[in-house]
Each structure stands twice: as structure tokens, then as C-alpha cells.
């Protein structure tokens, strides 16, 4: 009997559990699509619950969230609760997908004095009792801000900088808020144009602005797109696209959707919604598109204070005088700008790489802080920076009071901006701000080749291994071959040396600092009036005619090749020339004796001898006997036999003295022409021109 009673009790409770779960499943299963569209609000005012300063205006059919009075709040919610949780196929409960679209206008009390903004909100109640004005946006207050029991999610449209003195980095931004007014995600207001360029605009512009918010319940991804309705296209890329798993902790079974807004002390705006559509649950819910031509006209600024005629006359008179002064000031500024030709749009500004905003670079380099300097020279200073969109960068700020510096800037834009090769430093973009010229490169973490060859004590006590050196040599050769023969125009680098070779994290060589590069149409003569380059790497013909060529680049490469193998600088002493020294050992049959002693016996003798002989061939005193970079690479890859070195290879004592005196004469008489350049990414100090580094 007792056993039967126990069985009956168990079956009764089991039946109740089934009924409970079935009831819950039934309720959640009823999470049918909630969908509404408001083209204006006058005819649908019974569907909207407004409180505070919020009201539906019958004269213009708009939903006004706040007027321009100070320290007011307003809320407007869809009157019916919306089910936002549903059962999945695996009987789990998730937040439904939903989509909303609305068009809004913000009219500040006066230019620069608008505030504070508004939110699109998911709330457990159709109002926000106790919510405060100003930075709390009519959503929360100082007591409950950050409380998990709020169950509030908001997309904020903030026009004033700084919640709690800085949690919000800047005004005119969009943020995602979870139970808190400190945004978890925050983006400055921009849209992406048809060419995927960023274009900024203002929330308080007074023009209609469209917002599209879409949440995918399966991937928990929220997309927010915002742009002025004057555009004839919808941006393909949203401003915010983030996974927001936090919603599952915030959203209850039923929530209210709507808006909150607030003004502050001395900062106030009227916030309007022209139209609103919403759709949730179901399969791929999509809010209806709001056709601008069907929406009520946007609001206009008006003055309802009824100024007397004398005040109006005074205001009009002052306005006319101010306008005349502004026109005169504008004419004066334009005249000065034309005279100074400041920030004029050159042809190369249109045709070449992406232009960065100066403000972004200013912030990325911590306001060009001295501690972020990683190099000097080459007519400018190089800063380390970090962009949130693309990561670490190097910013080369070119000295603006140097005509040579301007020419260098244009040369780099012309060359690097259109070059693309794995052994060339990548130029991300450029910026011209007032009198400042800036180039933005990839940041190369290992710095320059000379820092790896000569740094004392050696980095981490490790000597650059032979196999790495040999690959670096071939990498530099490959980059020069691309410049000389494989691009659409011939590019003469004119300053090949270790400090202009960058080494990336995989120890690949990248040729950089094209500040002295010049483009030559194929078949034309070079027209150079000044000697440029670095002592020790300059071909002898440069001291006679100053004409840089691919052959002079080959000479500099030859010196650099010998330097990498030997671990010696090209002119370490008064009468020491590295190429002559190597040639002497080659003549005596002991060429491997010149290999860097720090390598010990850890090098490939065949490769070392091959590299040294190729280096000597490149250093021939006569340009016509030097190999092309294509032949150099074939020699190094073992695809061609290396020829014998010509018996007229070297310099006589008198020609060597003439070469040295001519170079020193040029350097001392025209310092601006010499290239004591510094790699845009190296973190070592610039070397003196006398040492050739």
C-alpha cells in the first residue's frame, strides 16, 4: 500500500513538471514576430507611451524626445511588451533576432552648446523612473548605474564628451551600454563611402540621420549602421559589428523597446524621431525600410521667445556687421592661402596612397610625444604609433621648412605609394597638415640591419647567423631588381646601405627610406644637379657627374654585400676601403679569411665565396662592367656561373684620392644634399656621414 502511494506521488509530481515545462515551452514558442512601422507618429500615438519632456507633436507629426530646456529627460516606448527570448532546436533559450530602423534629427540650442544625446533602449519597463538628465541620458541615475538588476541594454548617441570625466573618450560618438552608461564599445561617428573611406559627420548637424540596428540571435552579433539620409547609398560596412553575448544576461522574456533622451545644464538640444520600424523573432526579421519622401518633414530651428522689434533690429544689424567681417576675413585668409600655397591639393594627393587624418596620427603617437621617437634624420623625425584600426605604425614627420624635405616627401609618395614587393617597406599612407608632411609605414619590429650587425652588446648575445645573412642579401637583391626592372618605371634608390634595410619578425629584408628615390621613364637620361648618397657606398662616377643610375645602386649593393659578409664598415679607417681589402685577399687566394670572425666556422664556405666575388663584381670602378641586379640574383641563386673579375677592376691610388676628396668636398659644401638618412623604423641612433652609416 505504501509503495503504491509513493508511486502515485512520484507520478503526480512528474506530471506537474511536464505540465510546467510544457507551459514554459508553449509560452516561449508563442514568441511570434513582433513588427510595427511608424511613418510619423500622430496617427499611432496610442501605440507610444511618452513621459517627461517627450511628446508627439500634432503640428509636424514628429516624436519629440526632449525640447531645448535645460536638465530635462524624456522617454518614448512602444506600449506593448515584446517577447525577445525563444527556444532553440536544442531546447535552449536564446535572445531572439531583432531589427530596427529609425530616422532622427538633433537641433542644438546653439552651435557648440548642444547636449546630451539619446538612446535606443531595451528596457524591462515602458519608462525609466528615477532616471537623471545630462550624462545619464534619461536612462539611469548615479545610484543604479552599473547595477546588474537594471536589465537595460542601450545604443547611445552621445553628443557631449565624457561620462564621469572621461569614460567616454569623446563627444559625437556611438556606444553600446549594458546596465551602465560607460560604453563597453564606442566608435566616433563616421560612415564608409563607396570606396571604403571613412567620412565623419555630426549628430547635431540638424540634418536627418538614418540608423539601422540588426541583432542575429544565432551568432549573437549586433550591427549598427548610421549615415545622413542625404546619401544616395547605404554603406556596405556597419560602424559597429560586435558579438554581444552580454545580452543573454540582460534580456528578460518580455522587454519594452523605445528611446530615452536628456539635456544638461548650459548644454541642451531638441531630439526628434521622424519615423521608426521594428521587427523581432521569426526567421531573419527585418525592419521595414523608411522611405524619406514618405516621412514628415524634418524640424526647423525656431525662436518662440517673442523678442521685441528693437532687439530684432539690433540682432539683424549685428548679424550684418558680423557677416561682412567674416566675408572680409574669409577673403583675407583665402588670399594668404593662395600666396603661401599652403595645403593646396596636388596631383599626387589624388592619385596615390590613402590619406590619414592628422588627428588619428596625433593620438596614435601620443601627441607626438618625445618618448615615442624611434629615429631621426632623413629630413625628419620618426615616431612609433598605434592605430586602433591597423595596429603598430611608424610615422615619419618631415621637416616642413626644407624645400629638400618637400621634394623628398613627393618622391616617397611617387615611388613607395605605388610599389608593392615583399622586400620593400610598405607605405600605408600619408598626411599633409598645414606645414607638416607625414608618411605612415608598417612598423618593423627588428629595426635596421646595421643594428643587428654592429650593436654592442649584440642583441641578446646572438650573432646574425650565416644562413640569415645570405637570405638577407638575396632579399635586398630581389627588392632592387623589382625597382630597376620589374616595375612600370625605373626607380633608382640612390642610398642603399644597412640603416635603410629593415628586418621583420621573420628576418626578411625590406628595403626602405625612398626619400632620395627618383623615377625615370625607361630610355630617358637622368637629370640630377646635386650629389646624394652616403660616403662609402657612393659609386665613383657620382663624384664626377652626380648622375645616379641603376649601376650606382649596384655599386652600393656590392659594398653592402661585402659589409654583411665581413662584418666591417666600408671606411673604418683613414686609408681603409672594404672593397680594396677584400680584393687583396681574393688576389692572394685567401678570400674566406675576410668572413666575419664572429661567425667562427659556422658558415657555408661556397656561399660565402660566391657572395664575396659577386660583391666585388658589383664594386667595379667602371659602371659598364657591373652586373645588373637580375644577373646578381642569378649568380646568388646558382643559376649562372660567376665570371672572372676584370683586371681593371680597382682604383689607382690617385683616382682613389680624387674620389675621396671629391666626395668630402661635396659633403662639406652642401650638407643638405647628403643623405645621412635614418631608417623610418629603426630604434638605433643615426650614424655620422663620415663613417658611412
UniProtKB/Swiss-Prot annotation:
Please indicate the ranges of residues that lie on the Extracellular side: 23-311
List membrane-spanning regions. Answer: 312-332
Chief site of localization: membrane
Which Enzyme Commission number(s) are listed?
2.7.11.1
User: What's the catalysed reaction?
Assistant: L-seryl-[protein] + ATP = O-phospho-L-seryl-[protein] + ADP + H(+); L-threonyl-[protein] + ATP = O-phospho-L-threonyl-[protein] + ADP + H(+)
Q: Which residues bind ATP?
A: 374-382, 396
Chain ranges of the Protein kinase domain: 368-642
The region called Legume-lectin like is annotated at 33-279
User: Catalytic center at which residues?
Assistant: 495
Matching entries from Gene3D superfamilies are given as: 2.60.120.200, Phosphorylase Kinase, domain 1, Transferase(Phosphotransferase) domain 1
User: What's in the GO CC field?
Assistant: plasma membrane
Q: Which UniProt keywords apply?
A: ATP-binding, Cell membrane, Glycoprotein, Kinase, Lectin, Membrane, Nucleotide-binding, Receptor, Serine/threonine-protein kinase, Signal, Transferase, Transmembrane, Transmembrane helix
Which residue positions does the secretion signal occupy? Answer: 1-22
Q: How does it sit in the membrane?
A: Single-pass type I membrane protein
Task: Name where it's found.
Answer: Cell membrane
Annotated segments matching region Disordered: 670-693
Chain positions carrying an annotated carbohydrate: 21, 44, 71, 89, 141, 180, 223
Q: What is this protein called?
A: Probable L-type lectin-domain containing receptor kinase VI.1
Amino acid at each position: 500500500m505504501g509503495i503504491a502511494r509513493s508511486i502515485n506521488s512520484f507520478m503526480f509530481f512528474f506530471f506537474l513538471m511536464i505540465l510546467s515545462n510544457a507551459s514554459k515551452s508553449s509560452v516561449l514558442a508563442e514568441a511570434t514576430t513582433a513588427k510595427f512601422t511608424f511613418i510619423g507618429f500622430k496617427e499611432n500615438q496610442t501605440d507610444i507611451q511618452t513621459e517627461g519632456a517627450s511628446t508627439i507633436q500634432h503640428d509636424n507629426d514628429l516624436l519629440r524626445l526632449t525640447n531645448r530646456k535645460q536638465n530635462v529627460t524624456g522617454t518614448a516606448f512602444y506600449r506593448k511588451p515584446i517577447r525577445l527570448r525563444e527556444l532553440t532546436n536544442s531546447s535552449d533559450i536564446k535572445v531572439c533576432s531583432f531589427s530596427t530602423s529609425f530616422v532622427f534629427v538633433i537641433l542644438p540650442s546653439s552651435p557648440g552648446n548642444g547636449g546630451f544625446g539619446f538612446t535606443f533602449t531595451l528596457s524591462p519597463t515602458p519608462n525609466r523612473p528615477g532616471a537623471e538628465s545630462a550624462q545619464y541620458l534619461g536612462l539611469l541615475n548615479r545610484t543604479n548605474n552599473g547595477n546588474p538588476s537594471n536589465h537595460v541594454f542601450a545604443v547611445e548617441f552621445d553628443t557631449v564628451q565624457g561620462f564621469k570625466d572621461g569614460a567616454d573618450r569623446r563627444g559625437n560618438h556611438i556606444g553600446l551600454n549594458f546596465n551602465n552608461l560607460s560604453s563597453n564599445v564606442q566608435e566616433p561617428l563616421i560612415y564608409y563611402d563607396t570606396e571604403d573611406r571613412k567620412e565623419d559627420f555630426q549628430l547635431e548637424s540638424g540634418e536627418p540621420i538614418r540608423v539601422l540596428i540588426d541583432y542575429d540571435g544565432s551568432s549573437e552579433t549586433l550591427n549598427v549602421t548610421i549615415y545622413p539620409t542625404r546619401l544616395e547609398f547605404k554603406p556596405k560596412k556597419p560602424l559597429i559589428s560586435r558579438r554581444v553575448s552580454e545580452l543573454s544576461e540582460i534580456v528578460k522574456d518580455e522587454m519594452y523597446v523605445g528611446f530615452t533622451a536628456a539635456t544638461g545644464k548650459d548644454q541642451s538640444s531638441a531630439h526628434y524621431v521622424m519615423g521608426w520600424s521594428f521587427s523581432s523573432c521569426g526567421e531573419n526579421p527585418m525592419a521595414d525600410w523608411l522611405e524619406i519622401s514618405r516621412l514628415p518633414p524634418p524640424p526647423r530651428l525656431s525662436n518662440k521667445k517673442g523678442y521685441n522689434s528693437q532687439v530684432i533690429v539690433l540682432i539683424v544689424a549685428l548679424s550684418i556687421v558680423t557677416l561682412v567681417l567674416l566675408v572680409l576675413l574669409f577673403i583675407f585668409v583665402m588670399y594668404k592661402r593662395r600666396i603661401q600655397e599652403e595645403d593646396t591639393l596636388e596631383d599626387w594627393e589624388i592619385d596615390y596612397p590613402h590619406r590619414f587624418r592628422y588627428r588619428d596620427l596625433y593620438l596614435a603617437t601620443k601627441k607626438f610625444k618625445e618618448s615615442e621617437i624611434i629615429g631621426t634624420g632623413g629630413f625628419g623625425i620618426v615616431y612609433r604609433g598605434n592605430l586602433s584600426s591597423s595596429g603598430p605604425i611608424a610615422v615619419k614627420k618631415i621637416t616642413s621648412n626644407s624645400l629638400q624635405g618637400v621634394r623628398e616627401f613627393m618622391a616617397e609618395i611617387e615611388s613607395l605609394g605605388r610599389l608593392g614587393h615583399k622586400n620593400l617597406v610598405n607605405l600605408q599612407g600619408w598626411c599633409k597638415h598645414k606645414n607638416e608632411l607625414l608618411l605612415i609605414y608598417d612598423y618593423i619590429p627588428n629595426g635596421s640591419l646595421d643594428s643587428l650587425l654592429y650593436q654592442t652588446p649584440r642583441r641578446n648575445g646572438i650573432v646574425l647567423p650565416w644562413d640569415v645573412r645570405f637570405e638577407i642579401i638575396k632579399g635586398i637583391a630581389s627588392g632592387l631588381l623589382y625597382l630597376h626592372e620589374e616595375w612600370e618605371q625605373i626607380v633608382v634608390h640612390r642610398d642603399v646601405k644597412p640603416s635603410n634595410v629593415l628586418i621583420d619578425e621573420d628576418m626578411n629584408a625590406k628595403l626602405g627610406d625612398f626619400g632620395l628615390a627618383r623615377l625615370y621613364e625607361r630610355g630617358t637620361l637622368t637629370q640630377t644637379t646635386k650629389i646624394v648618397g652616403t660616403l662609402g657606398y657612393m659609386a665613383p662616377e657620382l663624384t664626377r657627374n652626380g648622375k645616379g643610375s641603376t649601376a650606382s645602386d649596384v655599386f652600393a649593393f656590392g659594398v653592402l654585400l661585402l659589409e654583411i659578409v665581413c662584418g666591417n664598415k666600408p671606411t673604418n679607417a683613414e686609408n681603409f676601403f672594404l672593397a680594396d681589402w677584400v680584393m687583396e685577399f681574393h688576389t692572394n687566394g685567401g678570400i674566406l679569411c675576410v668572413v666575419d670572425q664572429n661567425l667562427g666556422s659556422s658558415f657555408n664556405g661556397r656561399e660565402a665565396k660566391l657572395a664575396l666575388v659577386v660583391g666585388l663584381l658589383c664594386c667595379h670602378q667602371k659602371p659598364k662592367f657591373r652586373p645588373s641586379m637580375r644577373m646578381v640574383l642569378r649568380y646568388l641563386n646558382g643559376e649562372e656561373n660567376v665570371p672572372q673579375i676584370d683586371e681593371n677592376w680597382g682604383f689607382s691610388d690617385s683616382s682613389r684620392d680624387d674620389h675621396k676628396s671629391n666626395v668630402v668636398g661635396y659633403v662639406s659644401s652642401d650638407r643638405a644634399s647628403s643623405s645621412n638618412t635614418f631608417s623610418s623604423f629603426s630604434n638605433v641612433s643615426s650614424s655620422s656621414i663620415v663613417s658611412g652609416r
